[in-house]
């Protein structure tokens, strides 16, 4: 499977620990099938600088992976990133991460689908077309293992389906 350039979108303050777990999958064994963006480098900049960074980073990526936590769907930058990925014809996939533990060992509640509020050019909700993957497991280590197993295929599927929405 080819190595894909992936843009990870997530609610930074509540889910950065969970996001780091997913972003680092495969890096220890050096067999990751994706590489990601570095949100930490820009998060304290102006809105204009953040928009420019998102557009620049998105141009280098073939897919956006939205890591869906309890409040992800309410975050303006997540919505902006999804809209930009849609405008640019990128693959789009969501993965629920509420079952992964945070830095304190806590899981969170399942959040709303962030694709529901994005409307396509033909007036439909993006949520009608984009996969929002939920592992179905409740134990963090099983959630992690399931995401690790399915993430490469979810990315490939999103890229293959990008022209369908």
Regions found by a protein language model. Give the residues of each.
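A broadly tuned preference for mixed-charge, low-complexity surface segments
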Residues: 50-66, 116-126
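C-terminal interaction surface of TIR/SEFIR-family domains
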Residues: 5-7, 18, 103-165
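Conserved N-terminal substructure of TIR/SEFIR domains
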Residues: 1-60, 150-165
